[in-house]
């Protein structure tokens, strides 16, 4: 898929306007915008093909047998390597990485359906986001001159992301976890990438963390101004 392809989008608007008592008028509008927040790749941290481009090699999506064998997690077909301190203390075991990676796969709709395959370019899709915008205009009319020319003073209130005002968990934007800054996620480090390419060595992996936290989902809520509601007040004189 191309990176700009948006799977689905819904746009709707409803508006009601009325004048009353000769000198007043009110317009209320509600707009809805819903869409997935775009697409992204799921890549290896290092390059697999030896062409010098990092973070652009689409991962192989493992099956359960690749991560878990008869003896437990980390005993499957794939080889994972412990995270260790300089003193050799294990901080994130290969077995735990395999279990967490499998849970991560199961939490993503695309990955869950495509185990045992190479990830498709821009195959992962961001969660659906719905936002409502509320606009209220209050008009005050007055008339001047012999011909009773109409003048309007209009007070406006625009509530952007009105849904977030009602509930802080609504209308949030989404950001990709363990991202590379370009909308792609890089959850898997291929430690011996060059040796795999040049010598045919068996790949050795490490499952990355999301900062200091265990990586559990492809996307998480994005705490920024784009996720919060805002109010814009306006004053217009129409003549």
What is each stretch, according to the model?
Residues 7-9, 21-25, 37, 150-152, ...:
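Strand-connecting loop/turn motifs
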Residues 1-2, 180:
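Catalytic cores of eukaryotic secretory-pathway lumenal/extracellular enzymes that build
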Residues 2-7, 124-129, 225-227:
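Short sequence motifs at beta-strands and strand-loop junctions characteristic
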Residues 18, 32-39, 140, 159-166, ...:
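Transmembrane beta-strands of outer-membrane beta-barrel pores
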Residues 226-239:
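Outer-membrane beta-barrel "beta-signal"
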Residues 21, 25-146, 154, 179-219:
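Extracytoplasmic gating/loop element in the C-terminal half of outer-membrane beta-barrel translocons
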Residues 13-15, 135-137, 158, 234:
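Outer-membrane beta-barrel architecture
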Residues 40-45, 166-173:
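Short, solvent-exposed loop/turn and secondary-structure capping segments
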């Amino acid at each position: 898929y191309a990176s700009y392809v948006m799977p689905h989008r819904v746009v709707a608007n409803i508006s009601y306007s009325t004048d009353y008592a000769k000198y007043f008028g009110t317009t209320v509008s509600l707009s809805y915008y819903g869409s997935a927040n775009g697409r992204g790749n799921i890549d290896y941290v290092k390059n697999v093909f030896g062409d010098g481009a990092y973070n652009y090699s689409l991962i192989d999506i493992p099956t359960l047998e690749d991560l878990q064998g008869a003896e437990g997690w980390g005993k499957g077909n794939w080889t994972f390597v412990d995270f260790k301190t300089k003193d050799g203390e294990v901080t994130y075991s290969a077995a735990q990485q395999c279990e967490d990676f499998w849970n991560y796969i199961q939490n993503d709709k695309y990955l869950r359906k495509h185990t045992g395959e190479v990830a498709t370019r821009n195959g992962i899709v961001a969660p659906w986001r719905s936002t409502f915008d509320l606009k209220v205009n209050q008009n005050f009319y007055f008339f001047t001159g012999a011909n009773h020319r109409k003048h309007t003073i209009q007070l406006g209130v625009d509530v952007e992301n009105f849904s977030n005002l009602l509930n802080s968990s609504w209308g949030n934007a989404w950001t990709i976890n363990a991202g590379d800054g370009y909308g792609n996620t890089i959850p898997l480090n291929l430690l011996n990438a060059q040796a795999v390419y040049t010598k045919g060595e068996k790949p050795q992996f490490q499952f990355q963390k999301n900062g200091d936290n265990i990586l559990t989902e492809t996307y998480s809520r994005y705490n920024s101004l784009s996720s919060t509601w805002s109010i814009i007040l306006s004053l217009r004189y129409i003549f």
